Amino acid sequence: MARDRRDYYYHQAKEEGYRSRASFKLKQINEKHNVIKRGDSVVDLGAAPGGWLQVAKQLSGGKVLGVDLQRIAPIEGVETIQGDINADSTIKKIIRAVGEKGADVVLCDAAPNLSGNWSYDHARSIELTTSALECAKKILKPKGNFVVKVFQGDMFNDYLEKVRDNFVHVKAYSPQASRSQSAEIYVIGKKFLTAPLRRGDKFVVDIEKLGSGGDGAVLIEGFVVFVKEVEVGEKVRIKIADVKPNFAFADVEERLEKAEDSENLGNSEKAE
Protein backbone atom coordinates (compact mmCIF):
# COMPACT_ATOMS: atom_id res chain seq x y z
CA MET A 1 0.00 0.00 0.00
CA ALA A 2 2.86 2.38 0.76
CA ARG A 3 4.17 1.83 -2.76
CA ASP A 4 0.70 2.56 -4.15
CA ARG A 5 0.48 5.82 -2.25
CA ARG A 6 3.67 6.95 -3.97
CA ASP A 7 2.31 5.85 -7.34
CA TYR A 8 1.32 8.61 -9.77
CA TYR A 9 -1.61 6.67 -11.21
CA TYR A 10 -2.82 5.70 -7.75
CA HIS A 11 -3.09 9.40 -6.87
CA GLN A 12 -4.66 10.25 -10.22
CA ALA A 13 -7.30 7.56 -9.73
CA LYS A 14 -8.17 9.02 -6.34
CA GLU A 15 -8.36 12.55 -7.73
CA GLU A 16 -10.51 11.59 -10.72
CA GLY A 17 -12.84 9.29 -8.81
CA TYR A 18 -11.77 5.98 -10.35
CA ARG A 19 -11.95 2.82 -8.30
CA SER A 20 -8.58 1.55 -9.53
CA ARG A 21 -5.32 2.84 -11.00
CA ALA A 22 -5.98 0.25 -13.73
CA SER A 23 -8.54 2.66 -15.19
CA PHE A 24 -5.65 4.51 -16.83
CA LYS A 25 -4.47 1.32 -18.52
CA LEU A 26 -7.75 1.02 -20.40
CA LYS A 27 -7.65 4.71 -21.28
CA GLN A 28 -4.16 4.31 -22.75
CA ILE A 29 -5.06 1.08 -24.55
CA ASN A 30 -8.01 2.79 -26.17
CA GLU A 31 -6.04 5.89 -27.12
CA LYS A 32 -3.54 3.65 -28.92
CA HIS A 33 -5.80 0.96 -30.39
CA ASN A 34 -9.34 2.44 -30.52
CA VAL A 35 -11.04 -0.72 -29.29
CA ILE A 36 -14.07 1.07 -27.78
CA LYS A 37 -16.03 3.50 -29.94
CA ARG A 38 -18.95 5.73 -29.10
CA GLY A 39 -22.15 3.73 -28.77
CA ASP A 40 -20.43 0.34 -28.41
CA SER A 41 -21.84 -2.30 -26.10
CA VAL A 42 -19.07 -3.45 -23.73
CA VAL A 43 -18.76 -6.49 -21.46
CA ASP A 44 -16.01 -6.51 -18.81
CA LEU A 45 -15.14 -9.97 -17.46
CA GLY A 46 -13.68 -10.14 -13.95
CA ALA A 47 -14.75 -6.53 -13.59
CA ALA A 48 -14.49 -5.94 -9.81
CA PRO A 49 -13.88 -3.41 -8.36
CA GLY A 50 -15.08 -1.57 -11.47
CA GLY A 51 -12.32 0.78 -12.64
CA TRP A 52 -12.53 -0.45 -16.22
CA LEU A 53 -16.34 -0.27 -16.13
CA GLN A 54 -16.13 3.43 -15.28
CA VAL A 55 -13.83 4.13 -18.22
CA ALA A 56 -15.81 1.90 -20.60
CA LYS A 57 -18.97 3.83 -19.78
CA GLN A 58 -17.23 7.15 -20.40
CA LEU A 59 -15.79 5.98 -23.72
CA SER A 60 -18.88 4.21 -25.03
CA GLY A 61 -21.90 5.88 -23.51
CA GLY A 62 -23.77 2.73 -24.53
CA LYS A 63 -24.58 -0.56 -22.82
CA VAL A 64 -21.84 -1.55 -20.35
CA LEU A 65 -21.99 -4.80 -18.39
CA GLY A 66 -19.64 -6.06 -15.68
CA VAL A 67 -19.31 -9.73 -14.74
CA ASP A 68 -17.48 -11.06 -11.69
CA LEU A 69 -17.64 -13.80 -9.06
CA GLN A 70 -17.72 -10.99 -6.50
CA ARG A 71 -20.45 -8.42 -6.13
CA ILE A 72 -19.60 -5.15 -7.91
CA ALA A 73 -20.70 -1.98 -6.14
CA PRO A 74 -23.19 -0.02 -8.29
CA ILE A 75 -21.94 2.35 -11.02
CA GLU A 76 -24.39 4.72 -12.64
CA GLY A 77 -25.46 3.48 -16.07
CA VAL A 78 -23.66 0.13 -15.70
CA GLU A 79 -25.29 -3.29 -15.28
CA THR A 80 -23.59 -6.11 -13.38
CA ILE A 81 -23.87 -9.88 -13.16
CA GLN A 82 -22.45 -11.94 -10.31
CA GLY A 83 -21.41 -15.24 -11.83
CA ASP A 84 -18.76 -17.56 -13.27
CA ILE A 85 -17.85 -16.86 -16.92
CA ASN A 86 -17.32 -20.60 -17.45
CA ALA A 87 -20.95 -21.36 -16.57
CA ASP A 88 -23.57 -21.61 -19.32
CA SER A 89 -26.04 -19.86 -17.02
CA THR A 90 -23.76 -16.80 -16.88
CA ILE A 91 -23.32 -16.77 -20.67
CA LYS A 92 -27.10 -16.80 -21.06
CA LYS A 93 -27.45 -13.87 -18.65
CA ILE A 94 -24.82 -11.90 -20.59
CA ILE A 95 -26.58 -12.52 -23.91
CA ARG A 96 -29.92 -11.51 -22.41
CA ALA A 97 -28.33 -8.28 -21.17
CA VAL A 98 -26.51 -7.27 -24.38
CA GLY A 99 -28.92 -8.80 -26.89
CA GLU A 100 -28.80 -11.76 -29.25
CA LYS A 101 -26.48 -9.95 -31.69
CA GLY A 102 -23.77 -9.86 -29.01
CA ALA A 103 -21.37 -7.27 -27.62
CA ASP A 104 -19.13 -4.95 -29.62
CA VAL A 105 -16.25 -5.25 -27.14
CA VAL A 106 -15.20 -7.77 -24.49
CA LEU A 107 -12.61 -6.76 -21.88
CA CYS A 108 -10.80 -8.76 -19.20
CA ASP A 109 -8.33 -7.20 -16.77
CA ALA A 110 -8.70 -10.05 -14.28
CA ALA A 111 -5.71 -11.77 -12.67
CA PRO A 112 -5.44 -14.92 -10.54
CA ASN A 113 -4.59 -14.75 -6.87
CA LEU A 114 -0.79 -14.77 -6.85
CA SER A 115 1.06 -17.48 -4.95
CA GLY A 116 4.62 -16.22 -5.45
CA ASN A 117 5.47 -19.30 -7.54
CA TRP A 118 5.91 -17.76 -10.97
CA SER A 119 5.38 -20.92 -13.05
CA TYR A 120 2.17 -21.67 -11.18
CA ASP A 121 0.94 -18.07 -11.39
CA HIS A 122 1.68 -17.91 -15.13
CA ALA A 123 -0.24 -21.15 -15.71
CA ARG A 124 -3.19 -19.81 -13.71
CA SER A 125 -3.11 -16.60 -15.74
CA ILE A 126 -3.24 -18.55 -19.01
CA GLU A 127 -6.11 -20.65 -17.66
CA LEU A 128 -8.04 -17.49 -16.76
CA THR A 129 -7.36 -15.73 -20.04
CA THR A 130 -8.33 -18.85 -21.99
CA SER A 131 -11.66 -18.83 -20.16
CA ALA A 132 -12.05 -15.15 -21.09
CA LEU A 133 -11.33 -15.92 -24.75
CA GLU A 134 -13.83 -18.79 -24.82
CA CYS A 135 -16.45 -16.54 -23.22
CA ALA A 136 -15.69 -13.76 -25.71
CA LYS A 137 -16.20 -16.16 -28.63
CA LYS A 138 -19.72 -16.86 -27.37
CA ILE A 139 -20.81 -13.26 -26.75
CA LEU A 140 -18.99 -11.07 -29.31
CA LYS A 141 -20.57 -9.69 -32.45
CA PRO A 142 -18.86 -10.46 -35.76
CA LYS A 143 -15.95 -7.99 -36.16
CA GLY A 144 -16.04 -7.23 -32.41
CA ASN A 145 -12.95 -6.40 -30.32
CA PHE A 146 -11.27 -8.15 -27.37
CA VAL A 147 -8.76 -6.94 -24.76
CA VAL A 148 -7.27 -9.27 -22.14
CA LYS A 149 -4.47 -9.07 -19.59
CA VAL A 150 -1.91 -11.89 -19.70
CA PHE A 151 1.16 -12.65 -17.59
CA GLN A 152 4.17 -13.26 -19.81
CA GLY A 153 5.87 -16.65 -19.69
CA ASP A 154 6.55 -19.79 -21.69
CA MET A 155 2.87 -20.33 -22.60
CA PHE A 156 2.27 -16.77 -23.78
CA ASN A 157 3.05 -17.35 -27.48
CA ASP A 158 0.69 -20.33 -27.64
CA TYR A 159 -2.06 -18.19 -26.15
CA LEU A 160 -1.31 -15.40 -28.63
CA GLU A 161 -1.79 -17.89 -31.48
CA LYS A 162 -5.21 -18.85 -30.10
CA VAL A 163 -6.24 -15.21 -30.21
CA ARG A 164 -4.83 -14.87 -33.75
CA ASP A 165 -7.01 -17.80 -34.82
CA ASN A 166 -10.09 -15.80 -33.89
CA PHE A 167 -9.31 -12.17 -34.80
CA VAL A 168 -8.10 -10.41 -37.94
CA HIS A 169 -5.67 -8.08 -36.16
CA VAL A 170 -3.82 -9.03 -32.96
CA LYS A 171 -1.32 -6.95 -30.97
CA ALA A 172 0.46 -7.25 -27.63
CA TYR A 173 0.73 -3.93 -25.82
CA SER A 174 2.02 -2.64 -22.49
CA PRO A 175 0.41 0.66 -21.45
CA GLN A 176 2.47 3.25 -19.62
CA ALA A 177 0.26 2.85 -16.55
CA SER A 178 1.51 -0.72 -16.06
CA ARG A 179 4.27 -0.80 -13.46
CA SER A 180 7.72 -1.19 -15.00
CA GLN A 181 8.47 -4.33 -12.97
CA SER A 182 5.18 -6.00 -13.94
CA ALA A 183 5.12 -9.03 -16.25
CA GLU A 184 1.60 -8.21 -17.40
CA ILE A 185 0.88 -7.40 -21.02
CA TYR A 186 -2.38 -6.80 -22.84
CA VAL A 187 -3.42 -8.81 -25.89
CA ILE A 188 -5.72 -6.91 -28.22
CA GLY A 189 -7.78 -8.74 -30.83
CA LYS A 190 -9.73 -6.69 -33.39
CA LYS A 191 -12.42 -7.86 -35.82
CA PHE A 192 -13.69 -11.13 -34.38
CA LEU A 193 -13.90 -13.87 -37.02
CA THR A 194 -17.06 -15.91 -37.48
CA ALA A 195 -15.81 -17.77 -40.55
CA PRO A 196 -16.45 -21.56 -40.72
CA LEU A 197 -12.71 -22.22 -40.97
CA ARG A 198 -9.46 -21.25 -39.29
CA ARG A 199 -5.76 -20.92 -40.10
CA GLY A 200 -4.18 -24.33 -40.54
CA ASP A 201 -7.36 -26.11 -41.66
CA LYS A 202 -6.86 -28.37 -44.68
CA PHE A 203 -9.30 -29.15 -47.50
CA VAL A 204 -9.36 -30.92 -50.86
CA VAL A 205 -10.98 -28.63 -53.45
CA ASP A 206 -11.69 -28.42 -57.18
CA ILE A 207 -10.67 -25.16 -58.87
CA GLU A 208 -13.56 -24.15 -61.12
CA LYS A 209 -12.85 -20.45 -61.56
CA LEU A 210 -10.29 -17.73 -60.95
CA GLY A 211 -10.88 -14.50 -59.06
CA SER A 212 -10.19 -11.04 -60.50
CA GLY A 213 -6.65 -11.16 -59.08
CA GLY A 214 -5.85 -14.44 -60.82
CA ASP A 215 -6.07 -16.68 -57.74
CA GLY A 216 -8.36 -19.68 -57.66
CA ALA A 217 -11.68 -18.98 -55.92
CA VAL A 218 -13.58 -21.76 -54.14
CA LEU A 219 -16.49 -21.87 -51.71
CA ILE A 220 -16.12 -23.79 -48.44
CA GLU A 221 -19.37 -23.88 -46.46
CA GLY A 222 -20.43 -20.77 -48.34
CA PHE A 223 -17.19 -18.93 -47.47
CA VAL A 224 -14.88 -17.67 -50.25
CA VAL A 225 -11.30 -18.98 -50.20
CA PHE A 226 -8.65 -17.69 -52.61
CA VAL A 227 -5.99 -20.24 -53.59
CA LYS A 228 -2.65 -19.08 -54.96
CA GLU A 229 -0.90 -20.49 -58.06
CA VAL A 230 -3.61 -22.79 -59.40
CA GLU A 231 -5.38 -23.27 -62.72
CA VAL A 232 -8.99 -23.97 -63.58
CA GLY A 233 -9.53 -27.73 -63.66
CA GLU A 234 -7.05 -28.65 -60.92
CA LYS A 235 -7.93 -30.65 -57.82
CA VAL A 236 -5.67 -29.66 -54.93
CA ARG A 237 -5.16 -30.12 -51.23
CA ILE A 238 -5.00 -26.68 -49.58
CA LYS A 239 -4.05 -25.28 -46.18
CA ILE A 240 -5.73 -22.11 -44.91
CA ALA A 241 -3.04 -19.44 -44.45
CA ASP A 242 -5.04 -16.39 -43.39
CA VAL A 243 -8.68 -15.67 -42.55
CA LYS A 244 -10.45 -12.33 -42.99
CA PRO A 245 -14.05 -11.45 -42.03
CA ASN A 246 -15.43 -12.20 -45.53
CA PHE A 247 -12.83 -14.42 -47.21
CA ALA A 248 -9.66 -16.45 -46.63
CA PHE A 249 -6.37 -17.21 -48.38
CA ALA A 250 -4.92 -20.69 -48.82
CA ASP A 251 -1.73 -22.29 -50.10
CA VAL A 252 -1.50 -25.49 -52.13
CA GLU A 253 -0.06 -28.42 -50.17
CA GLU A 254 -0.52 -31.08 -52.85
CA ARG A 255 -1.72 -31.18 -56.47
CA LEU A 256 -4.10 -34.07 -57.13
CA GLU A 257 -5.86 -35.23 -60.32
CA LYS A 258 -7.58 -32.83 -62.69
CA ALA A 259 -11.02 -31.83 -61.44
CA GLU A 260 -12.78 -33.31 -64.48
CA ASP A 261 -11.54 -36.75 -63.37
CA SER A 262 -13.42 -36.39 -60.09
CA GLU A 263 -17.06 -37.38 -59.70
CA ASN A 264 -17.47 -34.63 -57.08
CA LEU A 265 -16.69 -31.69 -59.36
CA GLY A 266 -17.09 -28.39 -57.56
CA ASN A 267 -17.19 -29.88 -54.08
CA SER A 268 -14.76 -29.46 -51.22
CA GLU A 269 -14.00 -31.86 -48.42
CA LYS A 270 -12.17 -31.43 -45.12
CA ALA A 271 -8.74 -33.07 -45.28
CA GLU A 272 -7.57 -34.96 -42.21
From Swiss-Prot:
It holds the Pfam family FtsJ. Keywords: Cytoplasm, Methyltransferase, rRNA processing, S-adenosyl-L-methionine, Transferase. GO terms for biological process: RNA methylation. The keyword rRNA processing applies. Residues 196-254 form the TRAM domain. GO terms for cellular component: cytoplasm. One of its GO terms (molecular function) is RNA methyltransferase activity. It is found in: Cytoplasm. It catalyses: uridine(2552) in 23S rRNA + S-adenosyl-L-methionine = 2'-O-methyluridine(2552) in 23S rRNA + S-adenosyl-L-homocysteine + H(+). The keyword S-adenosyl-L-methionine applies. S-adenosyl-L-methionine binds at residues 50, 52, 68, 84, 109. Specifically methylates the uridine in position 2552 of 23S rRNA at the 2'-O position of the ribose in the fully assembled 50S ribosomal subunit. Belongs to the class I-like SAM-binding methyltransferase superfamily. RNA methyltransferase RlmE family. This is Ribosomal RNA large subunit methyltransferase E.
